[in-house]
Structure formats: structure tokens, C-alpha cells
Curated annotation (Swiss-Prot):
Pfam families registered for this protein in UniProt: Flu_PA (PF00603)
Motif (Nuclear localization signal 1 (NLS1)) on chain: 124-139
Enzyme Commission designation: 3.1.-.-
Residues bound to Mn(2+) 1: H41, D108, E119, I120
Keywords: Cap snatching, Endonuclease, Eukaryotic host gene expression shutoff by virus, Eukaryotic host transcription shutoff by virus, Host cytoplasm, Host gene expression shutoff by virus, Host nucleus, Host-virus interaction, Hydrolase, Inhibition of host RNA polymerase II by virus, Manganese, Metal-binding, Nuclease, Phosphoprotein
InterPro entries associated with the record: INFV_PA, PA/PA-X, PA/PA-X_sf
Essential cofactor(s): Mn(2+)
Organism: Influenza A virus (strain A/Equine/London/1416/1973 H7N7)
Protein name, as recorded: Polymerase acidic protein
Molecular function (Gene Ontology), one example: RNA binding
Subcellular compartments: Host cytoplasm; Host nucleus
Position of sequence motif Nuclear localization signal 2 (NLS2): 184-247
Details of cofactor binding: Binds 2 manganese ions per subunit.
Length: 716
């Protein structure tokens, strides 16, 4: 980009832009997009004023070449491009001679014909958005705003465009040329995305009373009053590099910028302790489903009817027994709860008309499992404020857990293809504009790659369970409602299929606030023997409930079937996000689209078809101890989708913190790989803030392990 700027713009403009950046302590070699933006803005300001004069009669005239002796005065005074001191001197002088109101911010030009200051904007975004930002910042009706975009759009105060059509067309053509030149060098995308909005300055308002006392009390050292501090902040000149800015700060601050080299970063320290356990709201790769193809039974589509029909496809039920108890729970209660579900489903069958929903009898085992009457009694604060030793109960620090191999296996499985399609190709009608055609083509290619993916099954399962649970929580607050865990898909031949994974029993659900918790017991079918990795199933009581005949290469084999039972809980806000898990498809589609865009911008034509159909090309998928893993574009789509789905399934404060903080190191490492010589301070503090998020969450621990692999290979 730097080379492009030096070739594309007049040397005088380049020099002025460099001076302006240095005045603000910015380096044109590093902030190359900003360098290009400043040059573009300067050039537009100069073009705006070029050839515009005022003659002896005070009329505005356009003269491109003519009599050098004619008594002409430049119509526009150029303020942009001067150093700050000189620029303010010019503004003050104009205000004194023309009685114009002094602007709060340095404008770009003064128009002697219209007697007004002019603010020129050049934007890579929508003109009206940028116009509003400018107007918000300036807050003055006296300054005229004129915005140009790289797409040929413009917007001006009161639609008064000041200049003639031809002068404005010259500016638009030049901007379009700059855009084309950038695109041909693959620079446009990065330039377009790097634009920041206008910073707005808050209005001054008076602070009085308690707030004023608090403000005075919380001033940094060395300041006697809020006024002093305000005056200091207003006069804080942001020139010079970061160190000089820091040295201008309080004497308490002392820090040095350390160079960041290949040897600076160290691997993250991951916690020790027992292996981490499964904590998703439903089973993932270990789930087993009973299915019916081409369902056409009476009441098809009513969850309870579908569930009963699915249950009838299995004939290997046996007397259930506990094979892996829950360490802390009353395990016979879980066993009795399952027997109760079977018995009450059987009772339904004996009724003439099966109801649409089923509320379970409030037995002692269900009351225990759903925590009925377990909430501590609430006491009015007035009744206990005189108790001298009143305190919040001590809570233990969470026990640290180490990374276990099962979470990587879960992730690998989520990226795989199943033999069913879990989403339909959306029919959105005929495309009207060419861009819609490209967009729907990309969507169709992406859908084809992910519709059979296991992560997509998890999305549909999550959406169904959360929707059903939220509905039941609102419709049957006091009831222990039985909710089947169902999903729907299509087979390879296009036949419809309904699947049952198990059941949920919901507890009392008077959910007033978003974070109020509803307890539920989940009971899920599986063929996974919990005794192989008992640490994985710490939160579950597992029963053996039947034997299933499986077809294998050597004939039929009988395998024990298990039921994974646990008490769990969720809240309105979690269910709301769970219902919106389809967003994961959108997020990963957008990531793929930006890859397609980058490819298209390099080649200067739409590369969607080649991108998805070139089966020989491989793309980086992720890091492993072996190095950078690569795969087909379909594999990339499915991996990105699985990451997005796992971020939703394993959402937690630990994940939020880890993602936000570790990203900072990734950005610094990227800057190092781009030879931008990054500098840092308090890198130890950054590591601390990342490592305090590594406690016991399986998905966060796996991401930390990937992060360490990335560091190893990125800095070789």
C-alpha cells in the first residue's frame, strides 16, 4: 500500500500527509491505510478548490488557464494540509475579517463566495452514515458539509453541492480510479474495511453535588481540581510516539515499550487436575436416535405423538439398572424417574385419545431431581439487618481441570458428514440484481457443503430443544412437563425422517428475569459405555436400559443401550440464544464469503464458482501438533461452522474472556509476521488475563491447546 500511495499521488500531497501523520505520532509505513486515506482527502480538497476564482465583480468563475494579469481571487482558502498552528491562525484571521463564527474543529476550506467554512469528507462506507457522523461531531449549522464516496455517491448540507457538475464529476472520477487501482493490486478490501467512524466530543455539562465530590475525590495524583484536570486533558497534544504520550501522564505511570520478537511469546500455561467433563446441555457424538422414515401416523408433527411412534421402533427394552452412578446424587431416584417415564407413556397408550402434552406426576424422585422446594427461603432484609455477623456465604474456587482428549474427538466428529440433510435449500424467489445472483450462488454452494454436516444436526437439535423448553416454561409454569428431544431431517433419497434422542422433564418455571433458572432432567439414549471414560460423565447417572441389534460386516451383533440421565438448568436468555443457533450458519457463511471476496478482488472478477469447484486446491483449516492442517473448501466450511456451533454450545464467561484476550496476542503475532516491528508493554499482564480464563471448561482448554500449537508454528 505504501508503494502504491507514493506512485499514485503527487509528491507534494504525499509529503503533506507524512507531516500530518508524524504530527500525530503515526507512522505512514505502519498505518498504510490511514496514509492512503489522508492523501485521498488532501487531493479531494485541492481538486475542490482548483480553477475556482472570484472576479472583480465578486462573481464565481472557473478558469483553467488564462490571463495571468486578470484580477482574480481564489474562491477557496485551503486550511487542510497546513500544520495545526498555522491552520488555526488562518481560521482566526478569516473569522476576524469576515465576522464568521469560529468553528470548534479545524475545517478543510473556506468559501469566500458563500462566506462559510466547508468540511470535506471522503468515505468508503455509506455517504449518509458518514454525513451524520460528521454533522454530529461538528454540531454547527454554519459549517457546510460535503461528502464524496468511492462509489460516485455524494451528499451535502441541504443538498447544496456548491460546485458545478463538471468539477464534482472530476473528483468522483478520480476517486473511482483510485479504487480501481487499489483493487487491481488487491489493496481495496483492506482499505475499505479499515475506515473508522468520526469520534464525537461529548457536550460539556456541569457536575454538582455528590457527583462533583466523587469527581474531585477520584482525580489522578497531581491534580487539585476537576477544572485543572479538564484543562490538562483538553491541552493534551497527541504528538510524538506512545512513550512521550505516556510520559505526559501522571508521574505514577512508568512503562517502557518492549520490542516483540519471535522469542517473546511463551506457550499458555494450562491447568492441571482431573480431566474436564462433558457440560453441553445435550449429548453430541454419543447421542443415539430412534427414527421413523416418511412419518404419516395420526398426529404426525405433534412431538408427543412422534415420540411414542419412535419409541415403538425399538424392541430390546429390559429392566433398567445403574451402571455408572452420579458421585453426589441419589441414584435410585434417577432410575425411578426413567421407570416413571416408561410407565406414564404406557398409560397414555391405553387412553382413547392421546393428549398433545404430558405432565408428569409430581413423585418424590422427580421433586428431588428437579430441586423442588430446595431453594433457600427468602427473608426480608428488614428482618435481619441487625444481625451482627451477617455475611455472604463463602463460595469455593472452582476446581481446575486438565484438557481431556474427548473434546477434540467431539470437535472432529462435528466437522464430519452424516448421511442425512439437516437444512433445506431456502427458496427465496428469483434474483433481481446481479449482486443477488452472486449472493444466492454463494449461499447455495455453502449450503451444499454444510447441509449434511453433524454440526448442522446439533444446530437443529439445539433450536428444537430450546424452543420446546422455552414454550413449556411459559405455558406450563407449575407442571413437570415431559418434552421429547426431537429433530427432523431428510435421507439421501430425500425421504423425511423424524428422530427421537430422549426426553426432558421440566421443573417449575416462574421465569421473571432473563437469568432466572428453570431446572430440567434430561434422559438421552446412547450406545457409549460410560465405564470407558468415567471422568467424562461426572455429572451423569447412566442406566443400562436395553440391548440393540446392530448390522455389521460380520452380521448382527447385540450392543447394550444406555440412558444418560442428569439434572441440568437453563435460563430465558440462554434458551433465547439456543433458539437462534441458526445464526452459526450465517457467521460461518460470512467468513467463507470474505475468503471468496479476497480471491475475487485479486483476480478482479467473481471467483465464487472456481473457489467452490476447484477440488484440487487446499486451504488452511487449523493448527495441530503436526503443523498447519489443510483441507478442501468443503472441509473449511464445516470446520468454521463447527467452531461457531461449539462457541454456542459451550458458551461461558471463560470463553468470552479467553477469546477477547488471546486475540490481542494473535494480532501482535500477525503484525510480527507482516514485519511491522510491533512493540508491547506488560505482556506478562496480558498472559495473566488469558490464563485466568483457563479453569475447567473443555472448549476453552481445547482452544488454548490450539493457540499453543499456532504459536509454535507461526514463529518458527
Amino acid at each position: 500500500m505504501e508503494d502504491f500511495v507514493r506512485q499514485c499521488f503527487n509528491p507534494m500531497i504525499v509529503e503533506l500527509a507524512e507531516k500530518a501523520m508524524k504530527e500525530y505520532g503515526e507512522d505512514p509505513k505502519i498505518e498504510t491505510n490511514k496514509f492512503a486515506a489522508i492523501c485521498t482527502h488532501l487531493e479531494v480538497c485541492f481538486m475542490y478548490s482548483d480553477f475556482h476564482f472570484i472576479n472583480e465583480l465578486g462573481e464565481s468563475v472557473i478558469i483553467e488557464s488564462g490571463d495571468p494579469n486578470a484580477l482574480l481571487k481564489h474562491r477557496f482558502e485551503i486550511i487542510e494540509g497546513r500544520d495545526r498552528t498555522m491552520a488555526w491562525t488562518v481560521v482566526n484571521s478569516i473569522c476576524n475579517t469576515t465576522r464568521a463564527e469560529k468553528p470548534k474543529f479545524l475545517p478543510d476550506l473556506y468559501d469566500y463566495k458563500e462566506n462559510r467554512f466547508v468540511e470535506i469528507g471522503v468515505t468508503r462506507r455509506e455517504v449518509h452514515i458518514y454525513y451524520l457522523e460528521k454533522a454530529n461531531k461538528i454540531k454547527s449549522e454554519k459549517t457546510h458539509i460535503h461528502i464524496f464516496s468511492f462509489t460516485g455517491e455524494e451528499m451535502a448540507t441541504k443538498a447544496d453541492y456548491t460546485l458545478d457538475e463538471e468539477s464534482r464529476a472530476r473528483i468522483k472520477t478520480r476517486l473511482f480510479t483510485i479504487r480501481q487501482e487499489m483493487a487491481s493490486r488487491g489493496l481495496w478490501d483492506s482499505f475499505r474495511q479499515s475506515e473508522r467512524g468520526e469520534e464525537t466530543i461529548e457536550e460539556r455539562f456541569e457536575i454538582t453535588g455528590t457527583m462533583r465530590r466523587l469527581a474531585d475525590y477520584s482525580l489522578p495524583p497531581n491534580f487539585s481540581s476537576l477544572e485543572n484536570f479538564r484543562a490538562y486533558v483538553d491541552g493534551f497534544e497527541p504528538n510524538g510516539c506512545i512513550e512521550s504520550k505516556l510520559s505526559q501522564m501522571s508521574k505514577e505511570v512508568n512503562t517502557r515499550i518492549e520490542p516483540f520478537s519471535k522469542t517473546t511469546p511463551r506457550p499458555l500455561r494450562t491447568p492441571g487436575g482431573p480431566p474436564c467433563y462433558q457440560r453441553s446441555k445435550f449429548l453430541l457424538m454419543d447421542a443415539l436416535k430412534f427414527s421413523i422414515e416418511d412419518p404419516s401416523h395420526e398426529g404426525e408433527g405433534i412431538p408427543l405423538y412422534d415420540a411414542i411412534k419412535c419409541m415403538k421402533t425399538f424392541f430390546g427394552w429390559k429392566e433398567p439398572n445403574i451402571v455408572k452412578p452420579h458421585e453426589k446424587g441419589i441414584n435410585p431416584n434417577y432410575l425411578q424417574a426413567w421407570k416413571q417415564v416408561l410407565a406414564e407413556l404406557q398409560d397414555l397408550e391405553n387412553e382413547e385419545k392421546i393428549p398433545k402434552t404430558k405432565n408428569m406426576k409430581k413423585t418424590s424422585q422427580l421433586k428431588w431431581a428437579l430441586g423442588e422446594n430446595m431453594a433457600p427461603e427468602k427473608v426480608d432484609f428488614e428482618d435481619c439487618k441487625d444481625i451482627s455477623d451477617l455475611k455472604q456465604y463463602d463460595s469455593d474456587e472452582p476446581e481446575t481441570r486438565s484438557l481431556a482428549s474427548w473434546i477434540q474427538s467431539e470437535f472432529n466428529k462435528a466437522c464430519e458428514l452424516t448421511d442425512s440433510s439437516w437444512i433445506e435449500l431456502d427458496e427465496i424467489g428469483e434474483d433481481v440484481a446481479p449482486i443477488e445472483h452472486i449472493a444466492s450462488m454463494r449461499r447455495n454452494y455453502f449450503t451444499a457443503e454444510v447441509s449434511h454436516c453433524r454440526a448442522t444436526e446439533y444446530i437443529m437439535k439445539g433450536v428444537y430443544i430450546n424452543t420446546a423448553l422455552l414454550n413449556a416454561s411459559c405455558a406450563a409454569m407449575d407442571d413437570f412437563q415431559l418434552i421429547p428431544m426431537i429433530s427432523k431431517c431428510r435421507t439421501k433419497e430425500g425421504r423425511r425422517k423424524t428422530n427421537l434422542y430422549g426426553f426432558i422433564i421440566k421443573g417449575r418455571s416462574h421465569l421473571r428475569n432473563d437469568t432466572d433458572v428453570v431446572n430440567f432432567v434430561s434422559m438421552e439414549f446412547s450406545l457409549t459405555d460410560p465405564r470407558l471414560e468415567p471422568h467424562n460423565w461426572e455429572k451423569y447417572c447412566v442406566l443400562e436400559i436395553g440391548d440393540m441389534l446392530l448390522r455389521t460386516a460380520v452380521g448382527q451383533v447385540s450392543r447394550p443401550m444406555f440412558l444418560y440421565v442428569r439434572t441440568n438448568g437453563t435460563s430465558k436468555i440462554k434458551m433465547k440464544w439456543g433458539m437462534e443457533m441458526r445464526r452459526c450458519l450465517l457467521q460461518s457463511l460470512q467468513q467463507i464469503e470474505s475468503m471468496t471476496e479476497a480471491e475475487s478482488s485479486v483476480k478482479e472478477k467473481d471467483m465464487t464458482k472456481e473457489f467452490f469447484e476447484n477440488k484440487s486446491e487446499t486451504w488452511p483449516i487449523g493448527e495441530s501438533p503436526k503443523g498447519v492442517e489443510e483441507g478442501s473448501i468443503g472441509k473449511v466450511c464445516r470446520t468454521l461452522l463447527a467452531k461457531s456451533v461449539f462457541n454456542s454450545l459451550y458458551a461461558s464467561p471463560q470463553l468470552e474472556g479467553f477469546s477477547a484476550e488471546s486475540r490481542k496476542i494473535l494480532l501482535i503475532v500477525q503484525a510480527l509476521r507482516d514485519n511491522l516491528e510491533p512493540g508491547t508493554f506488560d505482556i506478562g499482564g496480558l498472559y495473566e488475563s488469558i490464563e485466568e480464563c483457563l479453569i475447567n471448561d473443555p472448549w476453552v482448554l481445547l482452544n488454548a491447546s490450539w493457540f499453543n500449537s499456532f504459536l509454535t508454528h507461526a514463529l518458527k
